[in-house]
């Protein structure tokens, strides 16, 4: 069986539905993990061709990549409510960077499967997702790629269905958004209007409210199997239409309370959208049994707390190790 550091791989890594990465599954200490390799960023470990100036530039870019990922994953692991799946490890082997997370035994649902559920169950699942996003936003972390593929559904030991948010690699902190020349990565169908304007070259503030718009689109699909309405002759995507000033049409099939909530979440002005916790509280009011403490809402995974997550050397050399245990070097 092929090995990757401490992991025994279940098969070759693949790029199916993976964007700028390849992924697969592996086992470590008897537990199953999802493993992702970042394709675009490579450390010049064996670069004997580049000039000293070019090599220094490559190393600096890698250091920036590492710093951003560590900060992002640290914030995720410190703030997750258990339904935003924590990162087990972020590490490098030779020139390639990887992360690992506990494998989720998902139900393989898409939004059309969710839409077939009773309305009360859809509301409960949306509340779980909103609470998970609120836990990220508590640390001012933006997921930036909320879409059906990045929300998995699974059964808990008690038999409830819960939701798990995955794939944070398009994410960033509000304090460190993509700069000039950097790309916002994600699915255009769920881009907020401000993300679209940023791509068009406008100067805009990118905040956690980006995720609220994406949730508005996603929740609309969960309830109706359809995207919010807009003029498809003028725009291809919801956020694009909103960025051009169009008010998205929320389905008349929705109950009035859900309809009004989605209208707020899809507001063209990010400052007028509710926070993720406000979305959760609205849904909790609609489903009185929903509380952040109940296991049918927040099903804590058994992935490690942030002080168990390691960043392996040679990403961090022992002589420069931070006192923060998230940056503790390990051995591969």
List each model region and its residues.
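Activation segment signature within eukaryotic-like protein kinase domains
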Residues: 125-126
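Conserved catalytic-loop aspartate of Hanks-type protein kinases
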Residues: 211
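ATP-binding glycine-rich loop module of kinase domains
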Residues: 21-70
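Conserved activation segment of eukaryotic-like protein kinases, specifically the C-terminal portion
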Residues: 181-198
């Amino acid at each position: 069986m092929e090995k990757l550091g401490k992991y025994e791989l279940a098969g070759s890594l693949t790029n199916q539905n993976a964007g700028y990465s390849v992924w697969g599954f592996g086992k470590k200490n008897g537990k199953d993990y999802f493993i992702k390799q970042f394709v675009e960023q490579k450390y010049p470990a064996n670069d004997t061709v580049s000039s000293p100036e070019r090599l220094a530039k490559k190393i600096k870019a890698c250091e920036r990549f590492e710093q951003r990922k560590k900060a992002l994953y640290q914030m995720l692991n410190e703030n997750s409510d258990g339904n935003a799946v924590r990162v087990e490890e972020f590490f490098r082997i030779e020139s390639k960077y990887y992360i690992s997370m506990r494998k989720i035994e998902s139900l393989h649902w898409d939004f059309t499967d969710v839409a077939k559920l009773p309305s009360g169950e859809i509301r409960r699942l949306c509340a779980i997702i909103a609470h998970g996003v609120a836990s990220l936003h508590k640390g001012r972390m933006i997921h930036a790629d909320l879409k059906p593929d990045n929300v998995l559904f699974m059964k808990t030991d008690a038999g409830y269905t819960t939701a798990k948010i995955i794939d944070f690699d398009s994410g960033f902190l509000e304090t460190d958004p993509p700069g000039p020349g950097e790309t916002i990565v994600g699915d255009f169908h769920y881009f907020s209007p401000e993300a679209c304007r940023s791509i068009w070259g406008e100067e805009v503030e990118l905040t956690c409210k980006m995720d609220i718009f994406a949730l508005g689109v996603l929740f609309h699909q969960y309830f109706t199997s359809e995207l919010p309405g807009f003029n498809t002759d003028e725009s291809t995507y919801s956020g694009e239409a909103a960025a051009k000033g169009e008010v998205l049409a929320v389905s008349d099939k929705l109950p009035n309370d859900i309809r009004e909530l989605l209208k707020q979440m899809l507001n063209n002005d990010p400052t007028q959208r509710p926070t993720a916790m406000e979305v959760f509280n609205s849904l909790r009011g609609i489903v009185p049994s929903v509380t952040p403490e109940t296991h049918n809402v927040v099903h804590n995974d058994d992935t490690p707390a942030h002080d168990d997550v390691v960043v392996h050397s040679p990403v961090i050399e022992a002589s420069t190790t931070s006192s923060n245990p998230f940056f503790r070097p390990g051995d591969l």
